[in-house]
Amino acid sequence: LNESNILEFSGGFTGRFANPDNRRRKRMDSKFLLEADYWSDLNNRNSMGLHSEASFSSVWPEIVWFFCNTPSKKGGETTLCDGIQLWKLLPAKLKLYFLKQPLKYSIEIQLPKTKNYKKKGKQDWITNTLGISGYLDWEENKAYLEVLRYAIYKVENLDSYAFTNHLIADNYNEPQIKNISMASGEAIPDEYIKIIKEKSFEIIYEHNWEKNDVLMIDNKRFMHGRKEFSKNSDRDILTIQTERSAFKG
């Protein structure tokens, strides 16, 4: 596999690709093949905490792909955490807490510039996805959404729950996330976040990249992150998001 055919390869497992992330650069003139890394880390280390890709979004990909053109000489490992194992490790009080109601992600999205200057004011956001509400502000050219989604996901073929979300991510890397709370508006206790992080560290796996490596990640079961690497590194990792896999009819 290489940069020129990885998209075609991933297409064999894909029913529909996810819409592109406009923060990332496109490759091979494709809106679905993107550079994985972008410099938004405020402390300039370019590390990233564990998260399920776009778990706060109206479109939550089923599969995330990574392809390595050039590994970093030092650092830059991709971290992985099995959400099923993490859920099993959490104490009962946390399980009861996250089972009782969904999370609420408050999202603000900068929209691409449009040539349609006739639209004014606000317009309701229409979606077929349960738990999504909000509106478009055409004068600000932004979308404001509230996304209700449980912190756990039922992995049907295994009859298990996976703890996969954005709760322990470094959310300064996600400027569109303005707040995360419970659906009721209740703030999530810092103590709970601390416990989740500690338990995730017990089972975290680090993938050391080699040229032409491919990772195909079940995004609703596994969370992933990235270890620190130098901004001057020639690390070149590409990413693709499969919104809906081809495994289902």
Specify the residue positions occupied by each region the protein language model found.
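N-terminal non-catalytic cap/leader segment that marks the start of a structured domain
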Residues: 1-54, 62
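Active-site environment of non-heme Fe oxygenases that use a 2-His-1-carboxylate facial triad
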Residues: 29-39, 44-50, 59-249
